[in-house]
UniProtKB/Swiss-Prot annotation:
GO cellular component terms, A-Z: extracellular region
Taxonomic lineage of the native organism: Eukaryota, Metazoa, Chordata, Craniata, Vertebrata
Family: Belongs to the peptidase S1C family.
Keywords: Disulfide bond, Hydrolase, Protease, Secreted, Serine protease, Signal
Gene: HTRA3
The protein's name in its UniProt record: Serine protease HTRA3
Organism of this sequence: Homo sapiens (Human)
GO biological-process terms attached to the record: negative regulation of BMP signaling pathway; negative regulation of transforming growth factor beta receptor signaling pathway; proteolysis
Tissue note: Widely expressed, with highest levels in both adult and fetal heart, ovary, uterus placenta, and bladder. In the endometrium, expressed in epithelial glands and the stroma. Also present in leukocytes. Isoform 1 is predominant in heart and skeletal muscle, whereas isoform 2 is predominant in placenta and kidney.
Enzyme class: hydrolase
């Protein structure tokens, strides 16, 4: 028995002696000699920590002396590589995967084939129809993405004449516009909101939003030579807005989208390309024009005037204005709109300096409410309005009864969303009937703005 044990030990020693020794790691790692394998399970460093070798995929053996380590998000369980997570996931390619590891394996394959990885969109199975996201219809529908982004800020505008005898609204013109501020400032063409009609009666502007809400509007500023106007509505809540881009950056051949409401068909969309961003007005027969227009083949119809012309980032680069013939339309560049708005703002600032009610104010925001409640637990529950930070001594507000800490919630019956609305009312209206929240009380004050000479 002892002899047999000695014999087995000798045979084992002989087998070990015949096994080739493990290759020593090089003193210096030469990555140029590393293989370039394609590994569905990902990569791990080799024993010398020099080259990357294939990791074991899900379901492959692991833990043995010659087995590769498990790949990303895998762990060795009872000799096999298993995923650390068992829940299904939805990928950005619209497919449902059994677990995160299956998605990562698919992402590695996609990277090798197309260079586009697959990301996790959500836990659980993909919603019905999401698998279509990888189809050409969804992949290349960039125009639909632009329209979805900008449509809520495009409005329909109608100009009526209120007949003095019959009380009926006689339509004079209609067109489009787009919202520039959350408080309801809208940009459109001057010819959409003005009329040379000699018929008696009072002209009225009506604005309809995409959600169907309608408001009366007033003209804030108008430049008939440039054919640009701003009008103002008083919404009950903050509105979606569009941002102005730089028309100077436009290139011929660039895709553009025109949107408006021709014939009262709201949010009618046409697309085209920019032919030129510098078509002189004199070339179009506009002798008094000093403006360069954007020429495009996007169709602009009657009623589309005043709507935005946007680039693929959803930025407004022009106002739809003229249609010469089929395939040739023109827009006022956004850089000219910016200049018009700057001049309007400068004029407002000058007028603001001439009329005042004597308060320092801040627009109510959730962060401001939290800040004020921290110092005053009895601060009222409000979601919008104007916080009176300070009342100037001997000012119209102080004489009228306004106090520090008051919250002005309405002016002349209109809810206040932004401080600019109160500033506009100070410039254009007198007296001002202010509805004020003071503690738990709702108070009314009549304030007459003073003019500074």
């Amino acid at each position: 028995m002892q002899a047999r044990a000695l014999l087995l030990a000798a045979l084992a020693a002989l087998a070990l002696a015949r096994e080739p020794p493990a290759a020593p790691c090089p003193a210096r790692c030469d990555v140029s000699r590393c293989p370039s394998p394609r590994c569905p399970g990902g990569y791990v460093p080799d024993l010398c920590n020099c080259c990357l070798v294939c990791a074991a995929s899900e379901g492959e053996p692991c833990g043995g002396p010659l087995d590769s380590p498990c790949g990303e998000s895998l762990e060795c369980v009872r000799g096999l590589c298993r995923c650390r997570w068992s829940h299904a996931v939805c990928g950005t390619d619209g497919h449902t995967y059994a677990n995160v590891c299956a998605l990562q394996a698919a992402s590695r394959r996609a990277l090798q084939l197309s260079g586009t990885p697959v990301r996790q969109l959500q836990k659980g199975a993909c919603p019905l129809g999401l698998h279509q996201l990888s189809s050409p219809r969804y992949k290349f529908n960039f125009i639909a993405d632009v329209v979805e982004k900008i449509a809520p800020a495009v409005v329909h505008i109608e100009l009526f004449l209120r007949h003095p005898l019959f009380g009926r609204n006689v339509p004079l013109s209609s067109g489009s516009g787009f919202i520039m501020s959350e408080a309801g400032l809208i940009i459109t063409n001057a010819h959409v909101v003005s009329s040379n009609s000699a018929a008696p009666g009072r002209q009225q502007l009506k604005v309809q939003l995409q959600n169907g809400d309608s408001y009366e509007a007033t003209i804030k500023d108008i430049d008939k030579k440039s054919d640009i106007a701003t009008i103002k509505i008083h919404p009950k809540k903050k509105l979606p807005v569009l941002l102005l881009g730089h028309s100077a950056d436009l290139r011929p051949g660039e895709f553009v989208v025109a949107i408006g409401s021709p014939f009262a068909l709201q949010n009618t969309v046409t697309t085209g390309i920019v032919s030129t961003a510098q078509r002189e007005g004199r070339e179009l027969g506009l002798r008094d024009s000093d403006m360069d227009y954007i020429q495009t083949d996007a169709i602009i119809n009657y009623g589309n005037s005043g709507g935005p012309l946007v680039n693929l980032d959803g930025e407004v680069i022009g106002i739809n204005t003229l249609k010469v013939t089929a395939g040739i339309s023109f827009a006022i560049p956004s850089d000219r709109i910016t200049r018009f708005l700057t001049e309007f703002q400068d004029k407002q600032i000058k007028d603001w300096k001439k009329r005042f009610i004597g308060i320092r104010m801040r627009t109510i925001t959730p962060s401001l409410v939290d800040e004020l409640k921290a110092s005053n637990p009895d601060f009222p529950e409000v979601s919008s309005g104007i916080y009176v930070q300070e009342v100037a001594p001997n000012s119209p507000s102080q004489r009228g009864g306004i106090q520090d800490g008051d919250i002005i919630v309405k002016v002349n019956g209109r809810p206040l969303v932004d401080s600019s609305e109160l500033q506009e009312a100070v410039l254009t209206e007198s007296p001002l009937l202010l509805e004020v929240r003071r503690g738990n009380d709702d108070l009314l004050f009549s304030i007459a703005p003073e003019v500074v000479m």
